[in-house]
C-alpha cells in the first residue's frame, strides 16, 4: 500500500482508483513527474506495475502558477497482464510518439521520457562488454555541512584556515581557484566525512547539484563543502584519472541524463555507470590528455619572429575543447559507439557541452 508515514497523497489516490477499476478500465490523473523515478514514489510504481499498463503520458512541465513541480497526465489501463508500456502514446516538448519497444515497468523508474531510439541506445551502452562498476569498488564522502556558512566559511584566509572547494569551483578535470576558506577542525561542523577521505592522496570531486556529470581530480588533500562530494575509486588495473575521463564523457552524461533525469548526482547514479576496462596504452593516451586539462594553465606554442616561443595562458578555451574532444572520441569507442550513434548522443544532450 502507498499509505504510511511521509506518504504522497497523489500516490494514495492512484492506488485507490486502481482498486476500483475492473480489467480494461482506464484512469487518468494529473500527477507530479517525480512519480516516474523519485524514490519516495517507489511503492506506487510497484503497485502500478503489478496491476496496470501505461497507455498515455502527457508531460506538462511547470503547469501550475507559482509552483515549481513538473507535472504530467498519466493514463493507466487495468490489466490481467500488467507492467507494460508498449503502445503508450507519449506527448512531450511539442512532439508525440508511440512506444514501440516495450519497457517493463519497474519499481526503480518508469522509462517513459525516451523515444525508442534513445531507449535502445541507452540499453546497448549499459550492456557494453568488459566493464567494471564503482559499486563496491569506491569510497564515497559527502562534502562538509557546516550548519552555518556565514559563521564558518570566509572569503579571507585567516590564521589556521585553509582553502575549501565548493561546487562552483569544480569543472571537468580540474578545480578552479577557490575563494572560500575554513578551519580544518571537522568537529566544529554539523556533518563531515572522516578526515582521511578528504586527505586521500588522490580523489575525485564532483558537483552534487547539477544536471551534468562534472568530475575534477584532486591530489592536494583539499576539503570540500556539501555542494560537491568525493569519490575515491579502487578498481584494480584502472587509473583514477582514466575513470575521471569516463565519468566526464558524453557517453556517461547520456546514461545519467536519459536514465535518471536528475538534478542531483547521487552515489547510486555514479555506481551504475559502466566503466570499460581499457588496456594500459589506451589509459596512458587518455591520461596524458587529461593531465593537460587538469592544469590550471595550459602550455601552448606560438610563432614569434619565426621562432617557437612557449607561453602560459589560462584562457585558451579552444585548446581545452580540442583536448576534451580527443579524449571523448577515444572513450566513446571503448563503448563501441558508432559515428552515427555518437552524433545522436551529441544532438540529444542538453546543457553546457564542455564545463571545462
Task: Set out the residue ranges of the language-model regions.
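Non-catalytic DNA-recognition/assembly elements of restriction-modification systems
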Residues: 102-149, 161, 167-170, 277-356
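Signature of N6-adenine DNA methyltransferases within the class I
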Residues: 1-151, 223-228, 236-240, 263-270
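Short, flexible loop segments at the rims of nucleotide/cofactor-binding pockets, characterized by
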Residues: 3-7, 183, 313
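Alpha-helix boundary recognition
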Residues: 48-50, 166, 248, 346
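A generic secondary-structure signal for well-formed alpha-helical elements
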Residues: 21, 25, 35-38, 51-56, ...
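Polybasic, glycine- and aromatic-enriched phosphate-binding surface used to engage nucleic acids
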Residues: 11, 18-21, 118-285
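Generic beta-strand/beta-sheet core signal
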Residues: 30, 60, 77, 207-209, ...
Amino acid at each position: 500500500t502507498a499509505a504510511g508515514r511521509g506518504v504522497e497523497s497523489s500516490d494514495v489516490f492512484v492506488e485507490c482508483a486502481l482498486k476500483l477499476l475492473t480489467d480494461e478500465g482506464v484512469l487518468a490523473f494529473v500527477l507530479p513527474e517525480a512519480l516516474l523515478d523519485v524514490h519516495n514514489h517507489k511503492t506506487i510504481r510497484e503497485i502500478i506495475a503489478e496491476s496496470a499498463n501505461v497507455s498515455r503520458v502527457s508531460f506538462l512541465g511547470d503547469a501550475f502558477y507559482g509552483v515549481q513541480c513538473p507535472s504530467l497526465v498519466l493514463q493507466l489501463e487495468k490489466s490481467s497482464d500488467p507492467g507494460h508500456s508498449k503502445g503508450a502514446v507519449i506527448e512531450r516538448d511539442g512532439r508525440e510518439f508511440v512506444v514501440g519497444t516495450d519497457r517493463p515497468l519497474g519499481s526503480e523508474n518508469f522509462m517513459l521520457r525516451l523515444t525508442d531510439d534513445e531507449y535502445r541506445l541507452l540499453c546497448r551502452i549499459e550492456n557494453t562488454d568488459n566493464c567494471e562498476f564503482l559499486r563496491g569498488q569506491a569510497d564515497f564522502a559527502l562534502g562538509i555541512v557546516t550548519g552555518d556558512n556565514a559563521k564558518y566559511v570566509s572569503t579571507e584566509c585567516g590564521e589556521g584556515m585553509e582553502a575549501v572547494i565548493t561546487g562552483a569551483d569544480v569543472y571537468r578535470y580540474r578545480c578552479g581557484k577557490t575563494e572560500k576558506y575554513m578551519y580544518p577542525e571537522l568537529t566544529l561542523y554539523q556533518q563531515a566525512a572522516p578526515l582521511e577521505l578528504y586527505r586521500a592522496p588522490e580523489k575525485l570531486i564532483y558537483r552534487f547539484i547539477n544536471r551534468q556529470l562534472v568530475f575534477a581530480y584532486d591530489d592536494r588533500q583539499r576539503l570540500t563543502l556539501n555542494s560537491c562530494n568525493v569519490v575515491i575509486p579502487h578498481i584494480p588495473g584502472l587509473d583514477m584519472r582514466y575513470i575521471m575521463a569516463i565519468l566526464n564523457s558524453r557517453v556517461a552524461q547520456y546514461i545519467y541524463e536519459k536514465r535518471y533525469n536528475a538534478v542531483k548526482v547521487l552515489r547510486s547514479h555514479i555506481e551504475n555507470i559502466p566503466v570499460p576496462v581499457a588496456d594500459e596504452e589506451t589509459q596512458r593516451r587518455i591520461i596524458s590528455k587529461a593531465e593537460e586539462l587538469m592544469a590550471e594553465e595550459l602550455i601552448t606554442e606560438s610563432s614569434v619572429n619565426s621562432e617557437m616561443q612557449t607561453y602560459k595562458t589560462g584562457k585558451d578555451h579552444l585548446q581545452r575543447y580540442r583536448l576534451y574532444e580527443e579524449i571523448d572520441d577515444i572513450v566513446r569507442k571503448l563503448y563501441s559507439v558508432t559515428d552515427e550513434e555518437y552524433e545522436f548522443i551529441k544532438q540529444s544532450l542538453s546543457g553546457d557541452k564542455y564545463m571545462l
